[in-house]
Amino acid sequence: MEMEMEMVVAVPSPEVPAEEERALIRDITVAAEAHAKEGDTFFLITHRWWQSWIDYVIQDLANSTNNGSHHHEHGSNVLRRPGAIDNTDLIDDTASEVSNMEIELHDTLVEGRDYILLPQQVWEKLHGWYGGGPTLPRKAINTGLSQTDLAIEVYPLRLQLLLAPKGEQAVIRISKKDTVGELHKKACEVFDLIPDEVCIWDYYGRTRHSLMDNLEKTLDDANIQMDQDILVEVTTDANGSLDGGCIGSIQENEYLERESTSLIADASKSGLSNENFASNNYTSRSYSSSLTQSQYLRSSNGDLDNMHGTSAMITRGSPLGLTGLLNLGNTCFMNSAIQCLVHTPEFARYFREDYHREINWQNPLGMVVSTLSTSMALKPYV
């Protein structure tokens, strides 16, 4: 699942009235979310620019409440149309230098604070109106048994390839829904190797766990983690003849273990293991933003799929099941309040019935106070 990034700076089209922009984006968003499916492309846009656009297109609603009419009393209160889209604050130029991705995102981005996810049709409309860039596409992937269990893979797997016995290294990005065969192909392309002479190992924690020989299995099913190592083994000797292949390496691997030790030393000398990888508190950074129709271009907080950067949280290979939460702080009080509310019969009954009829959709104060409220104002409640 290749993900291409484009440093496209489009020329903006003639201006469209703010009210028309708001209506078009609302309608396009509702239609796009209703038909979202696996493989659809979504685009990141910086929250800073998005908020300026929101303020611009809803100012007529806000002013109609503040002034009692749609006319502004003071021309200085009129918000100007935003300039070109500028996503550069999302880009990590340093990380891009060592990855196969043309553009790398900062590791610590948070949806709703740093960026917003837009359906392709919405991005294309805004990009056509305002121009700018760079373009940051991401794919919707399936995360469950149902076809509707979709997520946006904002951060594809970042893997470090270690070539044995030469000791070369490379950093790549690949979707966790790609197959082992696709990883094998990409590794051969990176190191310019002959596929029939190469096998790859799950090298999590600098330990050879298993030979990755099931080419149809997805990396997710193979339990491959964010920022882990993949050992790429060339199965020919110095004379170019086969040395017994991967099966032989499993039985007689002393030479490979010595080479692996040297690879560890080489990696520690390079910047790959420390500076260019999120190796402190963010070692496992596999965000998947949940896509639901009950929210406007928002997803739940990206989950840290694998926090093996924290010694107490090594869960690789653990069976699925119930889990606890760590370091919740004061959120326990919020949880207690929610539990009380949802178990109050009158309160619960109210939200099971058609409470939508009591919502005043025309009240701009209630609908545009916060970022979430302004976003919700652009579409009917689903």
UniProtKB/Swiss-Prot annotation:
Keywords: Cell membrane, Membrane. SUPFAM superfamilies: Cysteine proteinases, DUSP-like. Its main location: membrane. InterPro entries: DUSP-like_sf, Papain-like_cys_pep_sf, Pept_C19_DUSP, Peptidase_C19_UCH, Ub_carboxyl-term_hydrolase, USP_CS, USP_dom. GO terms for molecular function: cysteine-type deubiquitinase activity. Residues 323-382 form the USP domain. GO terms for biological process: protein deubiquitination. Transmembrane segments: none annotated. It comes from the Eukaryota. Residues 16-141 form the DUSP domain. Belongs to the peptidase C19 family. Plays an important role in the development of floral organs and chloroplasts. Does not possess deubiquitinating enzyme activity in vitro. This is Inactive ubiquitin-specific protease 5. It comes from Oryza sativa subsp. japonica. The lineage of its organism: Eukaryota, Viridiplantae, Streptophyta, Embryophyta, Tracheophyta.
